[in-house]
């Protein structure tokens, strides 16, 4: 693989996807400390919201330590070069949430849907573009569809006004060949000025290999998370990925030592538990289950006595997707009854 001379935009997820690993309890001080560290290290884009995006605070997804408005208001004024993004899932986040983010200075809105449901994103993508925001269509659980189907959905988002489309491996299920086929299909058929992005999870240990495959296939934006802080076994560990890109002579604009220090000195100490590929996280990737289901399944194990990996395998068999968190406890309860 020769990526010499390629240029990528790296996007940190530690303060949004990392919310899942922290049960949405990141403090304002932690948020600001990490964000300013990332900014100083040269990270160009930093995502800040509830783990499930703007408006995600709920009984179903979890109540955060602070509101999205409080987090964004604390971080954005401190940024010297980095831009701040926010995730929005139609049905959770609203137009009012989007306007609030714009008014606070958010640069990028990423409108996320399941990989077959791009048609629900039209209003939010259109509004984001009307407000002059960098607007991303974020197609989750991309492993569940063929490259042709992903392209069909991507074209819908592009038609609504998205200037960047993401292939999102929410389960950490994809292998490099899968990433290549999906990204190549997008790059070959979308408008030449529509950027392509890739978001990986490390549940099968493939996030760096998959991200490299994405770059080779034409992706220009790559998500990562400092120290891997994110749902499941975490996202592509950003400091490790930067080191790999350095060796492969890919331009990224981040200071390696500085990003290593943010990971070691700021992010790792605030973890509730080590971000690693344990048996439950591995099961997420193996079964193709949404990564943020991990802690829900572990809580269901304690409540019903069914091993989390058994619950996750059953959820994978049923084809559950993000937004069906309420099914996790029901599934565990039914499995417990059947085994009684």
From Swiss-Prot:
Binding site for Mn(2+): 17, 199, 201
Catalytic-site annotation from UniProt: 20 (proton acceptor)
Broad EC category: lyase
Entry binding sites for substrate: 16-17, 170, 199, 290
EC number: 4.1.3.39
Site feature Transition state stabilizer, where: 16
Catalytic activity: (S)-4-hydroxy-2-oxopentanoate = acetaldehyde + pyruvate
Keywords: Aromatic hydrocarbons catabolism, Lyase, Manganese, Metal-binding
Domain Pyruvate carboxyltransferase: 8-260
GO terms (BP aspect): catabolic process; L-leucine biosynthetic process
Gene3D superfamilies: 1.10.8.60, Aldolase class I (3.20.20.70)
CDD domains hit by this protein: DRE_TIM_HOA
GO function terms (MF aspect): 2-isopropylmalate synthase activity; 4-hydroxy-2-oxovalerate aldolase activity; manganese ion binding
Domain of life (superkingdom): Bacteria
Pfam families in the record: DmpG_comm (PF07836), HMGL-like (PF00682)
NCBIfam families per the UniProt record, alphabetical: 4OH_2_O_val_ald, PRK08195.1
Family named by the database record: Belongs to the 4-hydroxy-2-oxovalerate aldolase family.
Protein name: 4-hydroxy-2-oxovalerate aldolase
Organism: Shewanella pealeana (strain ATCC 700345 / ANG-SQ1)
Taxonomic classification: Bacteria, Pseudomonadati, Pseudomonadota, Gammaproteobacteria, Alteromonadales
């Amino acid at each position: 693989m020769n990526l010499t001379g390629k240029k990528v935009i790296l996007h940190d997820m530690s303060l949004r996807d990392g919310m899942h690993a922290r049960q949405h309890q990141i403090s304002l001080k932690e948020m600001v400390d990490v964000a300013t560290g990332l900014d100083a290290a040269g990270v160009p884009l930093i995502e800040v919201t509830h783990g499930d995006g703007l408006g995600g605070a709920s009984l179903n997804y979890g109540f955060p330590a602070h509101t999205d408005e409080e987090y964004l208001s604390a971080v954005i004024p401190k940024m010297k070069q980095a831009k701040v993004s926010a995730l929005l899932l139609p049905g959770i986040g609203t137009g009012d949430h989007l306007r609030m983010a714009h008014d606070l200075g958010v640069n990028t809105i990423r409108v996320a849907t399941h990989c077959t449901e791009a048609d629900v994103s039209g209003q939010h993508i259109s509004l984001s573009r009307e407000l002059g925001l960098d607007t991303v269509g974020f197609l989750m659980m991309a492993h569940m569809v063929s490259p042709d189907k992903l392209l069909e959905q991507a074209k819908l988002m592009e038609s609504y006004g998205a200037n960047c489309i993401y292939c999102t491996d929410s389960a950490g299920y994809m292998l490099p060949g899968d990433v290549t086929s999906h990204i190549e299909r997008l790059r070959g058929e979308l408008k030449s000025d529509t950027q392509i992005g890739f978001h990986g999870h490390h549940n099968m240990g493939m996030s760096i290999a998959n991200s490299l495959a994405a770059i080779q296939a034409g992706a220009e934006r790559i998500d990562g998370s400092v120290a891997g802080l994110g749902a499941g076994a975490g996202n592509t560990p950003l400091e490790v990925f930067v080191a790999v890109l350095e060796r492969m002579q890919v331009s990224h604009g981040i200071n390696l030592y500085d990003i290593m220090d943010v990971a070691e000195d700021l992010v790792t100490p605030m973890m509730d538990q080590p971000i690693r590929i344990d048996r439950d996280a591995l099961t997420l990737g193996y079964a193709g289950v949404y990564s943020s289901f991990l802690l829900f399944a572990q809580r269901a194990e304690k409540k019903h006595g069914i091993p989390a990996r058994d619950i996750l395998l059953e959820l994978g068999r049923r084809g559950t997707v993000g937004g069906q968190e309420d099914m996790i406890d029901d599934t565990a309860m039914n499995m417990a009854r059947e085994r009684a």
